[in-house]
């Protein structure tokens, strides 16, 4: 071990937008990532389709609808926001209803276009019908997040930076969204606990 090697390392690299390579068109430059939309880095048009109805997608849809956009949201699971804690989900769903956000569930997106998506019925695998939602000004990708410290090819991790760190440092801690994306409160508490115990 080198004398310059640290005694401990905290990996808090955060996360980045999940991009599933088997969905055609997902990397097209016209597709806006949810984080870029929320930060104002990428503007969106009036009529918006949010792809992904988990916590991030649902909150993005509500945010845009609150700002006056005509918003639709599409989700593969059978409900919007199933991963949102119950107390928060009640208010989130009320907001989506209040702002007339159009909701499409049980919809497995197979292709993304600059103005919409094509999808299949996720609840009925025997249904081979390909449906389309088109005519949007902007498509926002909010299917979740993955750790930034790994390199992935699709869903498979092909490089893990932490393994390299462990070779030079005896104590390596991964915290927050670097483990998995979740609420900021959870990530902050985790980082605090690790810092106290080093």
Regions from the language model: what does each represent?
Residues 1-47, 66-161, 168:
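A Rossmann-like FAD-binding core segment of flavoenzymes
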Residues 49-65:
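Glycine-rich adenosine-cofactor-binding loop
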Residues 57-60, 79-89, 149-160, 165-167, ...:
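A conserved FAD-binding loop/helix module that cradles the flavin
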